[in-house]
Amino acid sequence: MGKKLLQQRAGRGNINFRNPGWLRVGKVRYPTITGHHIAKVVDILHNPGMTEPVAKVKLDTGIQFFIPAVQGLISGQKIEVGEGSPASLGNIVPAKDLPEGVYVSNVELHRGDGGRYARTAGSYAIVVGKSEGKVILRLPSGKIKEIDENALVTVGTVAGGGVLEKPLLKAGNNYWKYKVKATKWPDVRGVAMNVVSHPHGGGLHQSVSRSSTVARNTPPGRKVGHIAARRTGRRDRK
């Protein structure tokens, strides 16, 4: 009897396939606030499984929250949050108060969503213009996006840029990289498995050796390859 496929084991919701969210420092988002506040950066922390460091910030009201740390932000630094805050490094300001050309990160689409864009290490968005009730940004992907003028943003570029340029050098480092993520590693190809482990496995060569197209109603243990494909292979040049 054959073994269960990787996707079948993942579908059971075993602890090995669940998102290890308990390792994170907490929810990285803006709090729901109004008015102007003075805040202090309590600490700069590593968030397991994420590329960017996070800053633990405490408001003058006692509320604590986490945001992606921007380049140049230091522990103990005082920042300003909310309406009327200047567009200085590390400050959290409404988008309408920003001049054109400034670099921002952890961008909200609507006020109160906590931040949705430019949150990973080294990323930023650029203010390119303003329209009625909207602020126009260029996102890291190059896409032009309009956000609500009252949406909060952090002035500066997210720290940790270039983290992907550091080579892993050995498989052991890659092991620890994926251990804190909801990703199974290493990812073994079906043709490299034994015949008992995968429909494409077995033989003395790494080839499917049969049609890899399967029907839509194929049973789960055999439903791998090109599922309900209209066509496969290269297209003929016209």
UniProtKB/Swiss-Prot annotation:
Any one GO molecular-function label of the UniProt entry: structural constituent of ribosome
Gene3D superfamilies linked to this entry: 2.30.30.30, Nucleic acid-binding proteins, Ribosomal protein L2, domain 3
Keyword tags: Ribonucleoprotein, Ribosomal protein, RNA-binding, rRNA-binding
One Gene Ontology biological process: cytoplasmic translation
Bias kind Polar residues: ranges: 206-216
NCBIfam families to which the protein is assigned, alphabetical: PRK09612.1 (NF007180)
Function noted in UniProt: One of the primary rRNA binding proteins. Required for association of the 30S and 50S subunits to form the 70S ribosome, for tRNA binding and peptide bond formation. It has been suggested to have peptidyltransferase activity; this is somewhat controversial. Makes several contacts with the 16S rRNA in the 70S ribosome.
Protein name: Large ribosomal subunit protein uL2
Organism: Metallosphaera sedula (strain ATCC 51363 / DSM 5348 / JCM 9185 / NBRC 15509 / TH2)
Gene that produces this protein: rpl2
